[in-house]
Amino acid sequence: SGCNFASQGRSNEEIRLADPEETGQGTTAETAANVNEVDPEYYLGETTFIGDSRTNGLLTYQLLPPEQVFAIDGSTQKTIRDDPFIQLGPDSDRLTVEQAVEQRQPHRLVIAFGVNAIPLMTEEEFMQEYDLLIDQLTGVSPNSRIVIQAILPVSGWKYQEMSYLTNENIDHYNRLLKEYSEENSYIFFDISSEFKDEEGNLAREFDAGDGLHFNQNFYQRYIQLLIQYQP
């Protein structure tokens, strides 16, 4: 199927995707697991994405509005926490991720970090900083559903240049993130296999040309997969 979910038992109330008063119907964990139970536009509209330049592509290709994408090029799960870079309106003050999430109270947070952090942190630091970020976000928006996105692959030639960022290494960190998600009852959203070639590297048709970033084909497919699986 190309998708791997890891989640643990949370009650339907805790993973409520939509307010019945807003949509005219209740959405439980069971129905949310079915494809397209929630209207695609509504599903995307109630989701906020937090990440680095790979997440920023959602803005570059105008697939989502700025108030739903909180991302800084080159950032990690640590550096993203302190920078007031988000404007939720033309005249609004610049907010940190924590302040913006507190203000917006999104139904769902999709968090995607990794490629910038792997070379800078030990495994322990990597997981600790991820945990600190999520603690900060759930502290101000306790009803947000947490979706941890698997780190997506890089091209084969890229990691020959950057030996610390092999897809084997990325897979290892994804196993750590999956374990962490299971332990904390978060959703682990792994669509890596959808974007890999036969050798397990980023497939050429999704490569923006630098082996690390993604092209428009990728983001269109990514949105399709989100709508299909609705994590």
Where are these regions (language model features)?
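N-terminal, intrinsically disordered, polar/charged segments of Gram-positive cell-envelope systems
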Residues: 1-46, 59
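Conserved SGNH/GDSL esterase-like catalytic core that processes O-acyl groups on lipids
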Residues: 37-129
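Loop/turn elements at helix/coil->beta-strand transitions in domains of secreted/extracellular proteins
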Residues: 44-46, 105-109, 141-146, 184-187
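A mature extracytoplasmic/lumenal domain signature
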Residues: 51-54, 62-63, 115, 150-153, ...
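N-terminal cationic-hydrophobic initiation segments that often serve targeting/anchoring roles
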Residues: 101, 137-139, 178-181
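Active-site segments of SGNH/GDSL-like serine hydrolases
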Residues: 112, 116, 138-171
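Generic structural signal for well-ordered alpha-helices
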Residues: 130-134, 174
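Catalytic His-Asp segment of secreted/periplasmic serine-dependent ester chemistry enzymes
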Residues: 154-231
